[in-house]
Curated annotation (Swiss-Prot):
It catalyses: RNA(n) + a ribonucleoside 5'-triphosphate = RNA(n+1) + diphosphate. Homodimer. The RNAP catalytic core consists of 2 alpha, 1 beta, 1 beta' and 1 omega subunit. When a sigma factor is associated with the core the holoenzyme is formed, which can initiate transcription. GO terms for biological process: DNA-templated transcription. The gene is rpoA. GO terms for molecular function: DNA binding; DNA-directed RNA polymerase activity; protein dimerization activity. This is DNA-directed RNA polymerase subunit alpha. Belongs to the RNA polymerase alpha chain family. DNA-dependent RNA polymerase catalyzes the transcription of DNA into RNA using the four ribonucleoside triphosphates as substrates. Residues 1-233 are annotated as: Alpha N-terminal domain (alpha-NTD). The N-terminal domain is essential for RNAP assembly and basal transcription, whereas the C-terminal domain is involved in interaction with transcriptional regulators and with upstream promoter elements. GO terms for cellular component: cytoplasm; DNA-directed RNA polymerase complex. It comes from Coxiella burnetii (strain RSA 493 / Nine Mile phase I). Its EC number is 2.7.7.6.
Length: 327
């Protein structure tokens, strides 16, 4: 069986073309015939549905009790303002949520750049229009941004009208930083073979996530999901233990073997996370609480672990082993 696996071609020519800062085109070749559509469709679906990101999830506007009303001195009604808030591209680093404020008075255009942010929060599209104020108008609002994945309707976060404060407006949240993904397959040639595939992925983001990083993360997610099928291990094995309680040797290796960036490695070392087994037991929230470890470093760690068939939040029974000593 191993000889058959080795006979499959793997992509050796990978090109990344930058169309714009938020638009990349990735070309992979050669692939066995049919694999272009197999991989292209899987990666596209993961990119569109499963990428983590941030979005504004709720708003409180002075003088507004519900979304079906208007704001004095503002051209748009509340529904339009909320729709425009959904278009704000926001990036949270090292935190799960953030409180934002917006205060503006006098005639003019209200843009995303008028939002006052906390540390670790960045507005990527400051020119995005939120509302227009007339001569004597004024707008004051308090916003909440949060991390998430995919799409979440406001009803999923509603705790009931009785416990919800008056004037708190919930927004449907589209957390995904991916704006558009398409793929196509063309013919590729290797020596005399002309029946091979070339996969072309066209990817656009909202600017909060680098397209190249996005495709790497999607590939890592796919690899991690398929890892269970490789050996068809029992659940206890996938949790880190073997059939006789043996520990996966990979978990005993130092974190340095993951070859993380200096920033990520130093953050883990400062928290006394010395072994890969220590790391995989941490959750995303645990790592985001680590000083100086941001979302980009978290994505890097998850991607590297996924490449090795591991993930964060694993339950390792009997960890650390009795014979494990600090190096």
């Amino acid at each position: 069986m191993q000889n058959v696996l080795k006979s499959f071609l793997t992509p050796k020519n990978i090109q990344v073309q930058t169309i714009s800062p938020c638009h990349f085109r990735i070309l992979l070749e050669p692939l066995e015939r049919g694999f272009g559509h197999t991989l292209g469709n899987a990666l596209r679906r993961i990119l569109l549905s499963s990428m983590p990101g941030a979005a504004i999830v709720q708003a409180e506007i002075d003088g507004v009790l519900h979304e079906y009303s208007s704001i004095e001195g503002v051209r748009e009604d509340v529904v339009d303002v909320l729709l425009n808030l959904k278009g704000v591209a926001i990036k949270l680093e090292g935190r799960e949520d953030a409180k934002l404020t917006l205060h503006k008075k006098g005639a003019g255009t209200v843009t995303a750049g008028d939002i006052q942010t906390e540390s670790g929060v960045k507005i990527v599209n400051p020119d995005h229009v939120i509302a227009h104020i007339t001569k004597d108008g004024e707008i004051n609002m308090t916003l909440k941004a949060a991390m998430g994945r995919g799409y979440e309707p406001s009803s999923a976060r509603s705790t009931g009208d009785q416990s919800r404060s008056v004037g708190l407006l919930l927004l449907d949240a589209s957390y995904s930083p991916i704006r558009r993904v398409t793929y196509s397959v063309e013919n590729a040639r290797v020596e005399k073979r002309t029946d091979l595939d070339k996969l072309i992925i066209d990817l656009e983001t909202d600017g909060t996530l680098d397209p190249e990083e996005a495709i790497r993360f999607a590939a890592a997610v796919l690899q991690h999901q398929l890892a269970a099928f490789v050996d068809l291990k029992q659940e206890s094995d996938r949790d880190g233990g073997g059939k006789e309680g043996k520990v996966n040797p990979l978990l005993l290796r130092p974190v340095e073997d993951l070859e993380l960036t200096v920033r990520a490695a130093n953050c883990l070392k400062a928290e006394s996370i010395n072994y890969i087994g220590d790391l995989v037991q941490c959750t995303e929230n645990d790592l985001l609480k680590t000083p100086n470890l941001g979302k980009k470093s978290l994505l890097e760690i998850k991607s590297v672990l996924a490449q090795k068939g591991l993930s964060l939040g694993m339950d390792l029974k009997g960890w650390p082993p009795a014979d494990l000593t600090d190096q």
